Amino acid sequence: MHNHHNGLKTAALFGVLWAVLLGLGAVIGSSMRSTTPIWIMALVGVGTTAYGYWNSDKLALRSMQAYPVTEEQAPQLYQIVRELSAKANQPMPRIYVSPTPAPNAFATGRNPQNAAVCCTEGILRLLSLRELRGVLGHELMHVYNRDILTSSVAAAVAGVITSVGQMLLIFGGGDRRNSNPLAVMAMALLAPLAAVVIQSAISRTREYDADEDGSALTGDPLALASALRKIHQGVQMVPLPPDQKLVNTSHLMIANPFRAGGVTRMFATHPPMQDRITRLELMAGGPAS
């Protein structure tokens, strides 16, 4: 459903991310005169990716202390999700609410048959039903475009690269016969940096696509634009604490859940909010009067 250019861009970024992982293994293997680290890097990457893929929903929901809600508890939420799921001819996801006052939402799960959508109590209080429908359209398109799989794989591979880089910095390559210690240390510093930049770029690309596809599903891009404006303001007033579990989940959320700081655009998991709003307004033919 999503933009063909963005699909190619995501595939290319994934290729570079895996190349960084294997390159890290190659540098270690070359310096230690062994190819074993290359295979270890590949196997760890595959194993971590598989774990992240199968458990992405549990990990994300647990990090936000989310609880399932019934249709009796949240009838309007169910009504919107059921309508949009039927319109997309897709199964109904499980619905959760997180008890945080910070306004946000995310979707998780390895495929549409095992998906969950979570809204915070803060976003349910903040948005109108029209705006909430725009947000849920965005989140459902993350599921239908398999973005949860994409982001989980990217996060897992980047996490492996970062962990290996940290170990190399601590142990210094480990082998006194190391023929090229400078190359190992340089890779230990640069590979995690590159991995985070690539993972962030993948995440930003998927956000743009979910905005576009979600607005096509709801037929109301201005509703999402209005919701994003409110969410951005709300997050600045009630940000999430920078807990590591929340940091690991933040790329799934519709907006960066932390207070704006000095992070450059290269490392941001979400596009600039004004860019997203402007794109949505262009989809609608201009801002609301």
UniProtKB/Swiss-Prot annotation:
Membrane keyword on record: yes
The enzyme's E.C. designation: 3.4.24.-
Binding site for Zn(2+): 138, 142, 207
Cofactor binding comment, as recorded: Binds 1 zinc ion per subunit.
PROSITE patterns (UniProt xref): ZINC_PROTEASE
Molecular-function GO terms, alphabetical: metalloendopeptidase activity; zinc ion binding
Membrane topology: Multi-pass membrane protein
Family: Belongs to the peptidase M48B family.
Protein's name in the database: Protease HtpX homolog
The organism of origin for this protein: Arthrobacter sp. (strain FB24)
